UniProtKB/Swiss-Prot annotation:
Family as reported in the entry's similarity comment: Belongs to the PCNA family.
PROSITE patterns, alphabetized: PCNA_1 (PS01251)
Function according to Swiss-Prot or TrEMBL: Sliding clamp subunit that acts as a moving platform for DNA processing. Responsible for tethering the catalytic subunit of DNA polymerase and other proteins to DNA during high-speed replication.
CDD domains given in the database record: PCNA
Name this polypeptide is given: DNA polymerase sliding clamp
UniProt keyword DNA-binding present: yes
Organism: Picrophilus torridus (strain ATCC 700027 / DSM 9790 / JCM 10055 / NBRC 100828 / KAW 2/3)
Biological process (GO), any one: leading strand elongation
One function term, GO molecular function aspect: DNA polymerase processivity factor activity
Disulfide bonds: none
Taxonomy, superkingdom: Archaea
């Protein structure tokens, strides 16, 4: 029988993160852990997560499998738990069974064929910046009431996030000495939809450093991880650029 145990905190973060862009996902179960990739209906944003076996306190798998679920139903289960609880999850034919203390709840699985798993494109760029998640979120929040787009600029000496409208302007400027790492041979800039970017960044609950890679008018890649009991869960956001006239 497929059976696993995971903390409520980590399950909630996984589900909330995926829920920023989709309502249904398909998890791929392998002996070394679980992976999931989702893309929003407009094909603007993509999330990819790798959840290693050691992120679970228990992980028993009869054979490789795929499980498609309605995220809102999983959220309803999570709401029954306390933040320090552990949820035991098992597959029972066409249902997913959750055990939380004295509560047992089952939800119907979706047809695997009804949920597609997108291919993760290769986004290659030698230009990147590593900074704290909180610094990026502050810059995005400052721009929230200015415009629906934000322009990221990377130079060999700094990283900035700027948003402008006819009447207002917001800019976050981080010089090289305030960044954890930077790689840039010549200035690059690209604009992205602010709503998507802020929603994705806010869904990362930890304040670990994140890596942003992009090129001028090119998709944005954000690599991050968040803590589990034993081994970090790693993830990547991809976001299409906002083309400017």
């Amino acid at each position: 029988m497929t059976r696993m145990s995971i903390s409520v905190k980590n399950l909630k973060e996984i589900v909330d993160m995926l829920g920023t862009i989709v309502s249904e996902v398909k998890f791929k179960l392998e002996p070394n852990g679980i992976s999931v990739t989702a893309v929003d209906p407009a094909h603007v944003a993509m999330i990819s997560l790798d959840i290693p076996k050691n992120a679970f306190s228990e992980y028993d798998l009869d054979a490789p499998d795929e499980i498609a679920v309605d995220l809102d139903k999983v959220k309803s289960v999570i709401r029954l738990a306390s933040s320090n609880d552990t949820i035991v999850i098992s597959k029972d034919r066409d249902k997913l069974r959750f055990e939380i203390g004295t509560i047992i709840k089952s939800i119907a699985l979706l047809d695997n064929n009804s949920v597609t798993t997108p291919r993760v494109p290769q986004i290659n760029s030698d230009d990147y910046v590593i900074l704290s998640k909180s610094d990026l979120e502050k810059g995005l929040r400052a721009a929230e009431d200015v415009s629906d787009a934000i322009r990221l600029t990377l130079t060999p000496e700094s990283f900035s996030a700027k948003s402008t409208s006819d009447s207002d302007e917001s800019e976050m400027l981080l010089p090289k000495d305030m960044l954890k790492d930077i790689s840039c041979s010549q200035p690059i800039k690209s604009s992205y939809p602010l709503e998507y970017l802020l929603k994705l960044v806010k869904s990362i609950s930890s304040n670990e450093d994140i890596k942003i890679s992009f090129k001028s008018d090119y998709p944005l890649s954000i690599e991050f991880s968040f803590n589990s009991e034993t081994e970090p869960i790693s993830g990547k956001f991809l976001l299409a650029p906002r083309m400017e006239s």
